[in-house]
Amino acid sequence: MGNGLWFVGVIILGAAWGQVHDWTEQTDPWFLDGLGMDRMYWRDTNTGRLWLPNTPDPQKPPRGFLAPPDELNLTTASLPLLRWYEERFCFVLVTTAEFPRDPGQLLYIPKTYLLGRPPNASLPAPTTVEPTAQPPPAVAPLKGLLHNPTASVLLRSRAWVTFSAVPDPEALTFPRGDNVATASHPSGPRDTPPPRPPVGARRHPTTELDITHLHNASTTWLATRGLLRSPGRYVYFSPSASTWPVGIWTTGELVLGCDAALVRARYGREFMGLVISMHDSPPAEVMVVPAGQTLDRVGDPADENPPGALPGPPGGPRYRVFVLGSLTRADNGSALDALRRVGGYPEEGTNYAQFLSRAYAEFFSGDAGAEQGPRPPLFWRLTGLLATSGFAFVNAAHANGAVCLSDLLGFLAHSRALAGLAARGAAGCAADSVFFNVSVLDPTARLQLEARLQHLVAEILEREQSLALHALGYQLAFVLDSPSAYDAVAPSAAHLIDALYAEFLGGRVLTTPVVHRALFYASAVLRQPFLAGVPSAVQRERARRSLLIASALCTSDVAAATNADLRTALARADHQKTLFWLPDHFSPCAASLRFDLDESVFILDALAQATRSETPVEVLAQQTHGLASTLTRWAHYNALIRAFVPEASHRCGGQSANVEPRILVPITHNASYVVTHSPLPRGIGYKLTGVDVRRPLFLTYLTATCEGSTRDIESKRLVRTQNQRDLGLVGAVFMRYTPAGEVMSVLLVDTDNTQQQIAAGPTEGAPSVFSSDVPSTALLLFPNGTVIHLLAFDTQPVAAIAPGFLAASALGVVMITAALAGILKVLRTSVPFFWRRE
């Protein structure tokens, strides 16, 4: 009966909503697919074989109250004529999934029932005065026969029939938050409104955009009309079936999904319907409507009392938010708190940038590294902020009639970046299963914009030399998210990373925001092909090299400095005037193959570089560990390793070694070194000497073969040469580790200049990335699997002697000397014959 009930609900809801003149009639696709099926089903009559619905017998209540009116005189003879319409009634066909084998029931419902009037009330006489045109409502619940005492049971949804979507409404009825809108601050006390176009500012068509507009993106305005989707009628169905369908003016949609989660946000004029579902948690739903609107809950058919409104906080000056979910007060308190926070986001501001900034900060929050695996509360908060940013962006763009080019590109880029972080870092999604789509642009305008941006990307790479513009070109390719865009910028991105690495080896500190931003988008476009399927040989080679160089750029000093920079930036950001944009603080460690950044030695290094503050040491240590763990989770993609470093995940005998890699070094196109804390059963294995036995280090050279062997590391000194010649070091990797088991650096020897620098050995007083003051051991890893110990680059511990100890030692020497002199004098006096001459 359930499918039939839905059939009834759709028909009646369509009839009720049909009173709004802006509704667009559409043909039921089932009807088109079912043409000709009437020949398969029939009923025997005196005149032939026809399909005819059943009709209630008016003499048999209660169904008889829904019988056809007498004036229609419907019989088996008149039913085939399809003269079923009667002005005072709505007819409804109730059937099941077996239709038309199941002929169904043809019911008639007086329109007075739909109007909520007594059955004996008469309709008002038609007026001759044309009604005043009223603007259609932004949000209109479609309640159907909710208030009809006879037929409402027929329209109950599957909620309360097979499950209860909101088992504990009181748990989801909570007071308004501290930062939500008030009468004096209708957009929230911490809201920083988005910029408005100046009076008379020109609206540029997307087809005329050029590099000059990119230079001045913050003052380039695009007209909303024709660029964004025009609002259109749409019926929003709550997936939880907890409330009746809602008629809205839709403006777009945001969808994020993967193998472990799905998020869908439907945007409308003064409306947002957000659904968050995960494999590891019950689904949650948030609905935002105008302040004066109420969404009624679908109640239990057996309950005589009318159902109340959906749960949620009290309404505000602009919106009312309803929160749905199966969480109860006995469930996880953090999950319930996260859902309540998500319910407050829509009333906390109107600027999309504030929500994206908060989402980035949420990703690096103190508990980000507290546990492994999916974390529903964090995922709900991240996706809630992400969806609300889209809600704010669309509303502001339609309200202003224009959108700034920098805001358009920024929203599309940062929302895509955050979607990946939320999916991989909070939901536990496989990296190659993540998909993301923001459908807020008009389809035709989107194609025009993408074509223009593709042209601008090619023009930037061909004519411009500025690092900032090249970073913008990679950002545009990231926004376009198309194979052609990625292929167009990949050679330039690979060259940029090589150039930055050369500057790093020369002693330059890569800490400016534009460098971070360029590294972020360059790394993203080089890693992207593995998401679209099996990468080509060229794509794999570029990605392997970018991963190797990112690992080389991530020395222990860089990792500690990154942690300190992130802590400082997060503490400084107020998400109002000072925003936190993650690409501006991007670290190569997050794009590397180093998965050891959350180990204790790195945490101590980061704490040692922390500046003085009033933050308690325990809190600072927790924040530091959280940031380090987040960097590791951000970088560690199992799918990425399978795509670009397949030898590290190669299976032998049907099983792969259950060893967690700490560092991967893809040294050739088909071989890698891997650092672990336990030996591997295959490859060429080396045990690193001089390391704490509690945290041993093993270095293994891996290929696609399954043979295993062990070797000893040979100690050597490189021969210094007077002339420039190839020493055979290009392609090798310089690795330094400490007795505590910390790998300080894995530096690629990529040029002849670099190999000459190593051959010259460390120079006292000349700082170099190959030298260190920390007691450590230096190795050289060759592409053929050979490893040698570079004695010249070892740093030995120097004994520290206090000045007091030196003074005491000198005094002791003087006293001992005086004592010996006295003894000799006594001996000479007492034994004179020792000195007699013969």
Swiss-Prot record:
Which regions face the Intravirion side of the membrane?
Answer: 825-838
Q: Which residues form the signal peptide?
A: 1-18
Instruction: Supply one GO BP term.
Output: symbiont entry into host cell
Provide the membrane-side ranges marked Virion surface in the record: 19-803
Give the transmembrane region(s).
Answer: 804-824
Q: Where is this region: Interaction with gL?
A: 259-323
UniProt-annotated stretches for the region Disordered: 174-204
Q: How does it sit in the membrane?
A: Single-pass type I membrane protein
Gene Ontology terms: cellular component: host cell endosome membrane; host cell plasma membrane; membrane; viral envelope; virion membrane
PTM section of the record: N-glycosylated, O-glycosylated, and sialylated.
Where does the protein end up?
Answer: Virion membrane; Host cell membrane; Host endosome membrane
Keyword line: Fusion of virus membrane with host cell membrane, Fusion of virus membrane with host membrane, Glycoprotein, Host cell membrane, Host endosome, Host membrane, Membrane, Sialic acid, Signal, Transmembrane, Transmembrane helix, Viral envelope protein, Viral penetration into host cytoplasm, Virion, Virus entry into host cell
- Write down the glycosylated positions: N73, N120, N216, N332, N437, N670, N784
Q: How does it assemble?
A: Interacts with glycoprotein L (gL); this interaction is necessary for the correct processing and cell surface expression of gH. The heterodimer gH/gL seems to interact with gB trimers during fusion.
Describe its function.
Answer: The heterodimer glycoprotein H-glycoprotein L is required for the fusion of viral and plasma membranes leading to virus entry into the host cell. Following initial binding to host receptor, membrane fusion is mediated by the fusion machinery composed of gB and the heterodimer gH/gL. May also be involved in the fusion between the virion envelope and the outer nuclear membrane during virion morphogenesis.
Q: Which family does it belong to?
A: Belongs to the herpesviridae glycoprotein H family.
Among HAMAP family, the record links this protein to: HSV_GH (MF_04033)
Record protein name field: Envelope glycoprotein H
Q: Which organism is it from?
A: Human herpesvirus 1 (strain HFEM) (HHV-1)
Ranked from the top, the taxonomy reads: Viruses, Duplodnaviria, Heunggongvirae, Peploviricota, Herviviricetes
